[in-house]
Design a protein with these regions (language model features):
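Conserved helix-loop functional segments at active or binding sites
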Residues: 83, 106-114
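Short gly/Ser/Thr-rich phosphate-binding loop of adenylate-forming enzymes
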Residues: 131-136, 176
Length: 192
């Protein structure tokens, strides 16, 4: 009796040449190696709210000199996502700030329009700072929200200071996702 389950592993690349080398070695989406299965390609698109490195569309309310940090240009993210997507990989991304969320939503929309695949389950991890217009776009793309409730307690103390009361009110609005029919799961960074 084999008691081990298959580990579905997200894989992360920073540049297209890294992913291309991986593909050149023959690794494909859903390939297995024993109990190891290649899952989605993961993009780390921004940082964290408390450090002011989550990428925001507007300057931080309590630090007007910064909007955080996008870790990809639009074209870098598109090129990497396109290479992963056209080779059968689902796309998933760490996005906390609304600029990172918008960038990834734009990228997924562009790639999935150019290369439609009904079987893809693309998703975004965190989904924290997002107004209702972005939430609506998220739903229309049928993305999975990998929410992390563990951060609510710490972030609730700083969210309004960081993004202002109006955007803070619309953020972490996972009840609205549920009402809209967004597929969600709660998890922690341990599995990422």
């Amino acid at each position: 009796l084999d008691l081990l389950e298959t580990l579905h592993q997200q894989i992360r690349f920073r540049r297209t040449d890294q992913l291309q080398r991986f593909l050149d070695l023959g690794y494909r989406a859903n390939d297995t190696m024993g109990h190891f299965k290649f899952g989605p390609v993961k993009f780390l698109c921004d940082g964290s709210l408390g450090s002011h490195s989550a990428a925001m569309r507007q300057p931080y309310h309590n630090d007007p000199d910064t909007k955080g940090l996008l870790l990809f240009t639009d074209e870098e993210l598109y090129d990497l996502a396109k290479l992963a997507y056209t080779n059968g990989y689902h796309l998933t991304a760490h996005c906390i700030g609304d600029a990172a969320l918008e960038q990834m939503i734009n990228t997924i929309q562009r790639v999935s329009t150019e290369f439609p695949h009904a079987d893809r389950r693309n998703g975004i991890i965190h989904c924290q700072i997002m107004d209702e217009a972005l939430q609506d776009r998220f739903r229309k793309l049928n993305l999975v929200a990998y929410v992390q409730p563990i951060f609510i307690k710490a972030d609730s103390a700083v969210v309004d200071d960081c993004v202002g009361a109006e955007l803070g009110r619309q953020s972490y609005n996972w009840r609205r996702y549920e009402d809209m029919g967004v597929h969600m799961c709660g998890l922690s960074l341990i599995h990422i």
